[in-house]
Amino acid sequence: MLCFQCEQTHSGTGCVIRGVCTKTPEVAAIQDLMIFASAGLSYVAKKLPDSCEAERKEAASLVIQALFSTVTNVNFDADVLTKALYHLVDFRDALKAKLPEDVELPLAATLDFSRDRETLVKQGESYGIASRQKTLGIDVTGLQELLTYGMKGMAAYAHHAAVLDYRDPDVDNFLLEGMAALTDHSLDIQALLAVVMRCGEASYKTLALLDKANTSSFGHPVPTNVKMGPSKGKAILVSGHDLLDMKELLEQTKDTGIKVYTHGEMLPAHGYPELNKYPHLAGHYGGAWMLQRQEFINFPGPIVMTTNCLMEPRKEYAGRVFTRDLVGWPGLTHLPDRDFSKVIEAALESEGFTEDQESRSHIAGFGHHTVLDSADAVVSAIKKGDIKHFMLVGGCDGIKSGRHYFTDIAEKAPKDWVILTLGCGKFRVTDLDLGKIGDLPRLLDMGQCNDSYSAIRVALALAEAFDTDVNSLPLSLVLSWYEQKAVCVLLALLHLGVKGIRLGPTLPAFITPNMLKILVDNFDIKPIGNSAEEDLQEILAAKAA
């Protein structure tokens, strides 16, 4: 196996024996084949006659589900993934009967996928990253992976929107186009870069789509005090990103006496009016995803994993974990739909918290709607000099010690700077008491990783107010990355022409030196420095210049 799609990949170069995420070579091979089959299906779907629009839409749905299933820490169940792979292939083959006779097909559209698991895994090894590096070179393969990971992130966000009945034909069409491009080995670096930039455009549309889906379904987030700890009583913990799962669980637990807590990136749920209206949405438990193996042991009730990030469960709590939708781990109880009766039964049978715990509070819900409602006051504060700078510190969190940099840079920023945060990277700064500038908190939690759209909307609005461009604003972006949704967000920012992004804690292993030179030359992307102090001095010097 060779997998280097996440920031924690082994030695910063790639996992070759077993994933740092605990993904096995078997699962890695099947996931590689899911990408290969998705590319073949996408090619076929793009060649269908105009009369086959329904089939093309279904193909996009299957590709979205397949891509999301291969995102880091989503599904580790080889049986489930194999079944999904065969479904892709069977649908691909059914669609080929609708093609004109003169259509030439690439190998990904014709390959006969073995129905024997051992042989199937060997096939996966033949069409994975390592084999393409040998035949296409590291730069072309690296760009293919950059494109693939951007589309994986897109697929995750598009899937969340789709479960709320929101689709965008432009998003679907690009996913088919982008995946089909992976079958064309004649594309050189410049041609692939062009597709990657189109992926950035489609990524931005996907972020906008999910924002519309969430706010139309649950209302615009509003600033909300969230208790960051538990209270006495029976309890259910919900992790992941799926707000519809949260809504349905809250509805089904009404009047049961059970308290529902958010975990990880579900924290922003508290800011949505249609979720916060439930009084038994009692607070938040724990920190970022990578702490779950310690935190879940001490949670006295069932745990629902709605999306990533799932880690290998410890035996002490594995029997209390329920997976939903595309999430999977062998042996865990999977819920095929939003009937949470088993979870509720488990909560009622569990001890629950025996006493209230003293805990701090955190204000969530500073989405773009709330911030832009105060735009005049913000612009006035900038003009008066009360606010000198904005700095976005957020993204994905992870376990590396170097990530304390993100805490340091927020804590040591000048007192007249506003800190924007989002994603699970927020847990690097939520413990900080940064105070206020006038009536505005210096720390504004804008939501989940997909709520990068809110940060972009605010930046674009400020640029318009000052009759300038985003790169001329008093704004710095310091992004932490971990998995493929962060790649989607990064490509969206590059599509908008945003420059000078600091990325860390390390640069992606799939970015080759030649690719990095292109990103630096065109977008001034830079790795985070040796220390927060050094980078702050560099930012201040650039402001003064």
UniProtKB/Swiss-Prot annotation:
CDD domains: HCP (cd01914). The keyword Transmembrane helix does not apply. Binds 1 [4Fe-4S] cluster. Gene3D superfamilies: 1.20.1270.20, 3.40.50.2030. Its EC number is 1.7.99.1. GO terms for cellular component: cytoplasm. Hybrid [4Fe-2O-2S] cluster binds at H241, E265, C309, C396, C424, C449, E483, K485. The modification Cysteine persulfide is found at C396. Belongs to the HCP family. Catalyzes the reduction of hydroxylamine to form NH(3) and H(2)O. This is Hydroxylamine reductase. It comes from Zymomonas mobilis subsp. mobilis (strain ATCC 31821 / ZM4 / CP4). The lineage of its organism: Bacteria, Pseudomonadati, Pseudomonadota, Alphaproteobacteria, Sphingomonadales. The gene is hcp.
